[in-house]
Amino acid sequence: MKALYFDCFSGISGDMILGALIDLGIDVEKWKTELNKIPVKGYKIEISKKQKNSIWGTDVNIIIDDHHSHRHLEDLLKIVDESGLSENIKTKAKNIFYKIAEAEAKIHNQPIDEVHFHEIGALDTIIDVLGSLILLEMLEVEEIYSSPLPLGSGFVNTAHGTIPVPAPATLEILRGIPVYKDGREGELVTPTGAAIISTVANFVQELPPIRVDKIGYGCGKKDFSFPNLLRVYVGELVESTVKERNIVLETNIDDMNPQIFGYLVEKLFKEGALDVFLTPVYMKKGRPGILLSVIAPLVMEERLSEVIFRETTTLGIRKIYVDKKIMPREIKEIETKWGKVRIKVANINGIRKAYPEYEDCKSIAERENIPLKDVILEIEKLMERE
């Protein structure tokens, strides 16, 4: 199974993510072609090699023509919806922008629709977020991991004045994420970097065994006594089956308006749940109820528990630690009459399974105005001939 690991020894920011992923050897022209599917103008991208403490990495500089442009969250979501990017990228991008906007709204005591500021409105942030997601999709990795994040210390000047490091919005975004301080001064994690990494990666204390194939370094803009670089590794996970430790949060609910469950499930996924499901149950005194089950990475326990307590009527949550085995998987492409479609293929000990990617099938069904089941059936027939 192909995996990617973010080694955040100097923190993380949007431009560092872009630089590190491009440094892996991505086809930059193909990436820029994908960027052109975003309905925004007024920027150009400069990519160069730079040295940080004798280590060379890729520096990505996004030059904005108009520095006076401001946008609200609604504007950003419209840009995402109107882009020609994949549904997978659109969903993750919306989650990232929501995280930044929610954090700023809470810190500045504003309704989320009134948040009007540089951080989510700036063009470079739009390119950081969507550009990073495009690069990750181009790499076709199945698993993404990250080290804990160093927060830095001191103070930083912003459009809102001088604020402490980590910036309050950054810390808000990182609730439930493993972080640490080691005495280094300076802002090491930006709100954009925090929002991207907390959306795409599973945080681990130790990197699972991986056969490293490529290594990339992305340059930060500031110079410190240590190399201001983000390092990424890409390679194959070594174990025949990937083992993953998760937590299951459960609670029985019998006194809540059922309309709330749909919103709750969406909220839990947005906050980092791996899976959420509802099971009808009979509880004490013969009362019908719903068993809410949430599967999540260990580091998301506190964050998701808070969502459950805040959004439901429950007074308690059970937690169960579980080990999960995953068949090694890879993504392949198959040529169809509608264009290329991604296929997820899993193999272990002679057992083979293959499935067309749902988002690709959904896009075809919507574009061609044909039933989704017909699209899936046609692609499955093509897969049998391969």
Swiss-Prot record:
Record carries keyword Glycosyltransferase: no
GO MF, any single term: lyase activity
InterPro entries in the record: Ni_insertion
Family annotation (Gene3D superfamilies): mk0293 like domain, Transcriptional regulatory protein pf0864 domain like
Cystine crosslinks: none
Alphabetized Pfam families for the sequence: Ni_insertion (PF01969)
Keyword annotations: Nickel
Family, as annotated: Belongs to the LarC family.
PANTHER family the record matches: NICKEL INSERTION PROTEIN-RELATED, PYRIDINIUM-3,5-BISTHIOCARBOXYLIC ACID MONONUCLEOTIDE NICKEL INSERTION PROTEIN
Name by which UniProt lists this protein: Putative nickel insertion protein
Organism: Dictyoglomus thermophilum (strain ATCC 35947 / DSM 3960 / H-6-12)
Organism phylogeny: Bacteria, Pseudomonadati, Dictyoglomota, Dictyoglomia, Dictyoglomales
